[in-house]
A protein has these predicted regions:
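Residue-level signal for inorganic ion chemistry
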Residues: 32, 114, 155
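Flexible, acidic/Gly-rich N-terminal and inter-domain linker regions that tether
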Residues: 1-104
Length: 181
């Protein structure tokens, strides 16, 4: 069985190449990119300006990740919110949303678990399970944006895991939100 490509982890140029390989015009990539990274939809079904047939083809060929909130805790002191998100494989990661005068910051996870072994950190207790994909990192930001109704202005990669141990994927994640500004 072929593994489906993770469509949200593709940049715009890669998405154009994928669309052309499916016999679609290059503009289709921009439409999909906007649905995923600007409108923040949770599935192909929400991409209503794309034909039902094309959306079905996409479902067959591509994985469309989406994190689901398991628990949300809010500080009574400053309104900071801590999110526990379930990934598509059942693993969970934490993210935090913080409001400041200069804007809203989110702290996201880059791994499930951690291999660093820091004595002060609970993330390392079970070791490293796996790196998050760029789309799973983006999904944390997108879910928080949808759940709070607020725009995110700053992203910190300091949740579960060591971002430098997932460096290449973290760089991909960091570049995507800046493209959609």
């Amino acid at each position: 069985m072929d593994t489906k490509k993770d469509i949200k982890s593709l940049n715009l140029e890669e998405l154009k190449t994928e669309m052309e390989s499916m016999g679609e015009k290059a503009f289709r990539a921009k439409q999909m990119y906007e649905w995923m990274h600007v409108k923040l939809v949770r599935s192909f079904d929400e991409m209503t300006n794309l034909s039902a047939k094309f959306r079905e083809q996409c479902k067959e060929k591509y994985e469309y990740t989406c994190v689901n909130p398991v628990r949300i805790q809010e500080s009574k002191i400053d309104g900071t919110k801590k999110f526990l998100f379930e990934l598509s494989d059942g693993n969970v990661v934490e993210s935090v949303w913080m409001q400041y005068k200069h804007g809203n910051s989110v702290c996201i996870s880059s791994q499930v678990g951690c291999r660093m072994g820091c004595k002060f950190c609970a993330s390392t207790l079970d070791g490293l399970e796996r790196n998050l994909t760029p789309s799973e990192m983006l999904d944390q930001i997108y879910a928080i944006t949808r759940l709070t109704g607020e725009r995110v202005s700053n992203v910190v990669v300091m949740g579960t895991g060591e971002p430098m141990d997932n460096y290449n994927l973290s760089l991909i994640h960091i570049s995507e939100p800046t493209r959609r500004s």
